[in-house]
Curated annotation (Swiss-Prot):
Species of provenance: Puumala virus (strain Bank vole/Russia/CG1820/1984)
Motif YxxL: where in chain: 178-181
Gene Ontology MF annotations: endonuclease activity; RNA binding
Annotated region (RdRP binding), positions in chain: 1-50
Region (Viral panhandle binding), start-end ranges: 1-175
Region (Interaction with host DAXX): 377-433
Region (Homomultimerization): 1-79, 100-120, 330-405
Region (Chaperone activity): 1-100
Protein name from the UniProt record: Nucleoprotein
Role according to the record: Encapsidates the genome protecting it from nucleases. The encapsidated genomic RNA is termed the nucleocapsid (NC) and serves as template for transcription and replication. The nucleocapsid has a left-handed helical structure. As a trimer, specifically binds and acts as a chaperone to unwind the panhandle structure formed by the viral RNA (vRNA) termini. Involved in the transcription and replication initiation of vRNA by mediating primer annealing. Plays a role in cap snatching by sequestering capped RNAs in P bodies for use by the viral RdRp during transcription initiation.
Family: Belongs to the hantavirus nucleocapsid protein family.
InterPro entries registered for this protein in UniProt: Hanta_nucleocap
UniProt-annotated location(s): Virion; Host cytoplasm, Host perinuclear region; Host Golgi apparatus, Host cis-Golgi network
Amino acid sequence: MSDLTDIQEEITRHEQQLVVARQKLKDAERAVEVDPDDVNKSTLQARQQTVSALEDKLADYKRRMADAVSRKKMDTKPTDPTGIEPDDHLKERSSLRYGNVLDVNAIDIEEPSGQTADWYTIGVYVIGFTIPIILKALYMLSTRGRQTVKENKGTRIRFKDDTSFEDINGIRRPKHLYVSMPTAQSTMKAEELTPGRFRTIVCGLFPTQIQVRNIMSPVMGVIGFSFFVKDWPEKIREFMEKECPFIKPEVKPGTPAQEVEFLKRNRVYFMTRQDVLDKNHVADIDKLIDYAASGDPTSPDDIESPNAPWVFACAPDRCPPTCIYVAGMAELGAFFSILQDMRNTIMASKTVGTAEEKLKKKSSFYQSYLRRTQSMGIQLDQRIILLYMLEWGREMVDHFHLGDDMDPELRGLAQSLIDQKVKEISNQEPLKI
């Protein structure tokens, strides 16, 4: 459909359809507000999908229109018989054809890259809000994160709660919590809150509050996080007392056997790791930790703290800065990200499809976590991750939620009842459960 007239007709037609679809969506939203039953909810979902599909098609046709107009302009230009663009510096034509023109006007190179954030400014901003609005926003961006991001992609949203307000000249005004929901092309400012940065900073500042309210991201729920955190103090204490395969202490003659035994334990390896971390501090993160210590936040100062694993309950995409200098914490997050990759690999392996389709269902949480955490100024100790995997890997895999299928006999019975009922009320072919 290269003809401009045809494309314009399609754009007009789709715009008309979109107006009707949006009106139907509004009607469906009103119906759900009045009577939120399953039928109205499914109708609302269908209307949302229709609007989304029409918007995508309309955007595609507008893109085609822009390309066609651009091509037409290019066609009217006098062409160089050599096929070289007028402003190309090559004397002879390249073997490559000319591609798209990339407009970089919107990019600000003074801003830091996506992997860098101003954690101190972000932390001070978040700590300035009341705990209820912070935890409710965390719930919306973790437990209900996928839905929230999908509905608000490409916008800067505001969370509002009655507990969050400010007095201006005696007038009480809501104090909104702003979070940006970027698309893949968005450029984020260093102090700008995104869902990933918000989860990271809040998980690091308020793990005790998260633990008390049992707020958990679905991706952590399916790898058995609830099982893992049960009896955490006893679990980590036992782990610390076990012999570490990476330590070979230099024992002087006459050293008591009890002391020799202690020097071989995981606890000693963690103490050595803590010494390394103490020498690698970044000034901004130290400033944030000091600021947080003066207020309500409950950041763990030791991996044996009861709330330590809850730092990762909402699946932050890196180790939170407030506990990055606690030995074993960054590696614990890496252990969870490997478990997520392991579960996704198991799920991809059991699905039907080509090898390429299965490969698409695999994930790389670990690589992403590693890259983001190391961008904050520390190197992860792979040996600690290995110790975690040796200690807890098998039992965690046994507690994965793999969406197990129905019992074959139960499925057969349910299907026969469906078939029978459909035949009674209709001449249509019954669907499979």
